[in-house]
Amino acid sequence: MKFKLTIYLLLKYYNLIETNYKIGNVNFGSEDATNFFIESLKKSNFYLEYGSGSSTILASNLNKTFISIESDKNFYNFLLNKIDNKEMLNFKSLGIVGDYSTPLFFNIRKHFLKSKVIHYVNDVLDTLSKSTKVPDLILIDGRYRVLCSLFLHNFFINKKDMPLIIFDDYLNRDYYHVIENFFKIRMVGRFAVLEELIQNDTRHLISKYTLDAR
């Protein structure tokens, strides 16, 4: 079974088979969370998301300026055909991935993925550091969510304005709650809304969370 799955994921990675993804309307598990995201996106002038999907299509349909970071090559190619502003969709490879962009054979490969992981999390921030324009809305909904939060903390800690940062699937996932050492949060449905930065050193956790793809 694992052999068949590996072959399937290899074929998918190299776009040798057609995958029919079903993307519905934006749904974050509750009316409160879904409406909060939609209204926040409508107000946004510049939106960044880690993890693509229905939110990407909505941002495109609303003619928003946005950057979407996607690590599943096959899904990235699928989305390219769904949006007009293709340059706003960015592929950052984590190699061959399975469901929800989890790297294949992660426990074996996690130490070898470190360079790719840093590119996935930080390339967009490196680009933004050279720009006068920064996002006012950020959705963390892809891989390496704690690491994304730590890098965002470091990026915005000395900036004048703090964006609205939404961390999806935070409710009931205790392994994410370490970020409360770095952000003051409030809950909206399953979202943690990161509202205020806390001055703390992230360096001791960066290496740890480059090995945690959750």
Locate each region found by the language model.
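Short, charged, surface-exposed secondary-structure boundary motifs
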Residues: 75-84, 99-104, 173-179, 194-199
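Membrane-proximal basic amphipathic "stem/tether" segments
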Residues: 1-28
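S-adenosyl-L-methionine
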Residues: 80-132
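SAM cofactor-binding core of SAM-dependent methyltransferases
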Residues: 31-102
